[in-house]
């Protein structure tokens, strides 16, 4: 992931391919639909080939589950916006703000992270809570980014 900053000088953030604990593909970077819902590249698609991706692939955002960025950029944009606390869309908003600075968001297809999706929220409440929180924060996100996404 660190090499991406050397190869892609305008890189603002980089993330790895995310896999479920069993090794199946969770996502290879994300796109955004005009309504703010994510497009998790490769998710649920057995024909999707991570090997076919470029080593450093441009994406709309990478998951905060494993995200690397320069400390100076993080401080300059004010870090994660607390309006999204405790979870969901804080990483998406962070990447959008980096993109607004002219920075690229990259997936590095040669790095992998095993991720238990929603593990934190499941421990706090339930899947219903995670869904409600995600939708609440999607609406906040759209209030901020609607014009750009459309």
Regions found by a protein language model. Give the residues of each.
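Active-site-adjacent helix/loop segment of glycosyltransferases
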Residues: 19-22, 96-150
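Conserved acidic
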Residues: 6, 90, 150
């Amino acid at each position: 992931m660190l090499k991406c900053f050397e190869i892609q000088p305008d890189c603002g953030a980089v993330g790895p391919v995310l896999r479920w604990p069993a090794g199946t593909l969770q996502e290879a970077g994300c796109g955004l639909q005009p309504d703010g819902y994510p497009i998790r590249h490769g998710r649920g698609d057995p024909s999707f080939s991570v090997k076919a991706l470029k080593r450093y692939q441009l994406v709309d955002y990478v998951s905060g589950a494993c995200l690397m960025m320069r400390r100076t950029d993080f401080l300059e944009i004010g870090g994660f916006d607390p309006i999204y606390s405790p979870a969901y869309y804080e990483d998406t908003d962070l990447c959008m703000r980096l993109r607004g600075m002219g920075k690229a968001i990259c997936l590095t297809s040669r790095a992998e992270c095993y991720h238990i999706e929603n593990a934190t929220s499941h421990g706090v409440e339930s899947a219903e809570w995670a869904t409600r929180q995600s939708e609440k924060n999607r609406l906040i996100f759209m209030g901020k980014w609607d014009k750009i996404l459309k």
